[in-house]
């Protein structure tokens, strides 16, 4: 995966470091939902990059967030987030990446994107995703 260095920042008496975000990215690339959710707080929020809401579709709580992530893997069985770069500052974090995947209908997607994070008690409390919208034939 991409180069990253440890950056330690205090957060609610817990350390959140860049390696934590890399571990989260690795779990996504492994499609390991249990490992993904171990990085999230019980009251986590996921704001998807698209949807009917102003900030994209919003999922609240571990069960809804888990189901939303599982749907990504169903929609893109080969989903991959490459070339990650992670940053942490206090109770906020940022990851940028290149998403590649093939929808079940054969549509290929390759786009840049990013996640904005809020941390609480050493875990991700909010994952707000943004990505370009470009489809390849």
Report residues per predicted region.
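Residue-level signal for well-ordered, solvent-exposed loop/turn and beta-edge residues enriched
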Residues: 45, 107, 123-125
């Amino acid at each position: 995966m991409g180069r990253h260095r440890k950056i330690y920042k205090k957060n609610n008496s817990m350390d959140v470091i860049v390696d934590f975000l890399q571990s989260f990215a690795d779990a996504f690339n492994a499609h390991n939902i249990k490992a993904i959710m171990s990085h999230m707080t019980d009251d986590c929020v996921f704001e998807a990059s698209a949807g009917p809401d102003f900030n994209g579709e919003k999922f609240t709580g571990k069960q809804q967030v888990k189901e939303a992530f599982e749907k990504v893997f169903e929609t893109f069985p080969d989903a991959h987030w490459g070339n990650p770069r992670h940053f942490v500052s206090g109770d906020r974090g940022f990851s940028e990446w290149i998403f590649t995947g093939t929808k079940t209908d054969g549509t290929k997607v390759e786009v840049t994107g990013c996640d904005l994070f809020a941390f609480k008690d050493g875990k991700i409390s909010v994952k707000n995703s943004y990505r370009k919208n470009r489809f390849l034939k």
